[in-house]
């Protein structure tokens, strides 16, 4: 099955990305009034489609799990489907705002893990907090996996989280 990602509406107007996103049937989200995209996401999930939601609402500059919006748990609850959280670490080495893009065959390790399905209870805030807790735990596991395979993360590097003595902003700095 293909994933139908929710993405901010402005990207759908971009000359290259817009037509691609539309052709792949992704869902534009109006950040002021997202009710139409929420309804569409619930309809898709009820039909058995996979709906991809970046619950943080943006890319975290801290490379940690930042505060999350409750849309994913609300969509899943209304559709009667689970949330299957995904955690990624390493992609920031390929493309981070303000840094040189590192595309092509770079052999840069990128770790992705899918967590166990979580069935929302209907308490969107509590569900979102629990999903975030599980994602943070998984991210810390990816850090351990990275260090087990490649040694300690290099201190001061822009792509390394501050908590791991890296040069990325702290979670508080990134959210300010």
Mark where each language-model region is:
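Catalytic core of membrane glycerolipid acyltransferases/transacylases, capturing the structured
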Residues: 1-33, 39-40
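Non-catalytic C-terminal accessory region of glycerolipid acyltransferases
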Residues: 35-176
């Amino acid at each position: 099955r293909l994933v139908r990602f929710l993405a901010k509406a402005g990207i759908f107007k971009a000359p290259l990305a817009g037509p691609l996103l539309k052709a792949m049937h992704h869902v534009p989200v109006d950040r002021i009034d997202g009710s139409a995209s929420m309804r569409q996401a619930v309809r898709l999930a009820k039909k058995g489609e996979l709906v991809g939601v970046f619950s943080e609402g943006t890319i975290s500059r801290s490379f940690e799990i930042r505060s999350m919006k409750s849309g994913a748990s609300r969509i899943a609850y209304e559709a009667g489907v689970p949330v299957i959280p995904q955690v990624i670490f390493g992609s920031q080495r390929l493309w981070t705002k303000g840094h040189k893009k590192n595309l092509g065959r770079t052999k840069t390790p990128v770790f992705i893990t899918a967590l166990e399905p979580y069935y929302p209870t209907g308490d969107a805030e509590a569900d979102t907090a629990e999903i975030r807790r599980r994602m943070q735990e998984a991210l810390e596991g990816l850090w351990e996996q990275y260090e087990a395979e490649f040694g300690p993360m290099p201190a001061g590097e822009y792509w390394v989280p501050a908590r791991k003595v890296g040069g990325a902003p702290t979670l508080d700095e990134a959210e300010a």
